[in-house]
């Protein structure tokens, strides 16, 4: 199912998902450094593999994904299938509601 068919996202639920599943490797605050994964500030509308100061896999650079709700929704289902060769070890979020919630949180927190 595509993002067009996704349930409405709840950014408060997404905040919990981010803290539990993403925050050990990612930050969202402007000016915050990179961790194991890149800082996600300014994520929406950015091309994959382009955050300054972070060493991306060739796969991430070459895929040239434009990050928006629809691409994140597909990517977060199974990152290694969406970008084979990505360094991201996270297996993905199988539930559409979890992905929609996380995207709602990211849309607000990374702007």
Swiss-Prot record:
<keyword id="KW-0408">Iron</keyword>
<keyword id="KW-0349">Heme</keyword>
<keyword id="KW-0007">Acetylation</keyword>
<feature type="binding site" description="covalent">
    <location>
        <position position="22"/>
    </location>
    <ligand>
        <name>heme c</name>
    </ligand>
</feature>
<keyword id="KW-0496">Mitochondrion</keyword>
<feature type="modified residue" description="N6,N6,N6-trimethyllysine">
    <location>
        <position position="94"/>
    </location>
</feature>
<keyword id="KW-0488">Methylation</keyword>
<comment type="function">
    <text>Electron carrier protein. The oxidized form of the cytochrome c heme group can accept an electron from the heme group of the cytochrome c1 subunit of cytochrome reductase. Cytochrome c then transfers this electron to the cytochrome oxidase complex, the final protein carrier in the mitochondrial electron-transport chain.</text>
</comment>
<dbReference type="InterPro" id="IPR002327">
    <property type="entry name" value="Cyt_c_1A/1B"/>
</dbReference>
<dbReference type="GO" id="GO:0020037">
    <property type="term" value="F:heme binding"/>
</dbReference>
<dbReference type="GO" id="GO:0046872">
    <property type="term" value="F:metal ion binding"/>
</dbReference>
<keyword id="KW-0813">Transport</keyword>
<keyword id="KW-0679">Respiratory chain</keyword>
<feature type="modified residue" description="N6,N6,N6-trimethyllysine">
    <location>
        <position position="80"/>
    </location>
</feature>
<feature type="binding site" description="axial binding residue">
    <location>
        <position position="26"/>
    </location>
    <ligand>
        <name>heme c</name>
    </ligand>
</feature>
<dbReference type="GO" id="GO:0009055">
    <property type="term" value="F:electron transfer activity"/>
</dbReference>
<dbReference type="GO" id="GO:0005758">
    <property type="term" value="C:mitochondrial intermembrane space"/>
</dbReference>
<feature type="modified residue" description="N-acetylalanine">
    <location>
        <position position="1"/>
    </location>
</feature>
<feature type="binding site" description="covalent">
    <location>
        <position position="25"/>
    </location>
    <ligand>
        <name>heme c</name>
    </ligand>
</feature>
<feature type="binding site" description="axial binding residue">
    <location>
        <position position="88"/>
    </location>
    <ligand>
        <name>heme c</name>
    </ligand>
</feature>
<dbReference type="InterPro" id="IPR036909">
    <property type="entry name" value="Cyt_c-like_dom_sf"/>
</dbReference>
<protein>
    <recommendedName>
        <fullName>Cytochrome c</fullName>
    </recommendedName>
</protein>
<keyword id="KW-0249">Electron transport</keyword>
<dbReference type="InterPro" id="IPR009056">
    <property type="entry name" value="Cyt_c-like_dom"/>
</dbReference>
<comment type="similarity">
    <text>Belongs to the cytochrome c family.</text>
</comment>
<keyword id="KW-0479">Metal-binding</keyword>
<dbReference type="Pfam" id="PF00034">
    <property type="entry name" value="Cytochrom_C"/>
</dbReference>
């Amino acid at each position: 199912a595509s993002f067009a068919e996704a349930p409405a996202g709840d950014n408060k639920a997404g905040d919990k998902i981010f803290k539990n599943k993403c925050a050990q490797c990612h930050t969202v605050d402007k000016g915050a450094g990179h961790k194991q994964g890149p800082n996600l500030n300014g994520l929406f509308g950015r091309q994959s593999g382009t955050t300054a100061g972070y060493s991306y896999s060739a796969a991430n650079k070459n895929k040239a994904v434009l990050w928006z709700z629809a691409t994140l929704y597909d990517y977060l289902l199974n990152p290694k299938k969406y970008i084979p060769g990505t360094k991201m070890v996270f297996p993905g979020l199988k539930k559409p509601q979890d992905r929609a919630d996380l995207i709602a949180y990211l849309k607000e927190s990374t702007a």
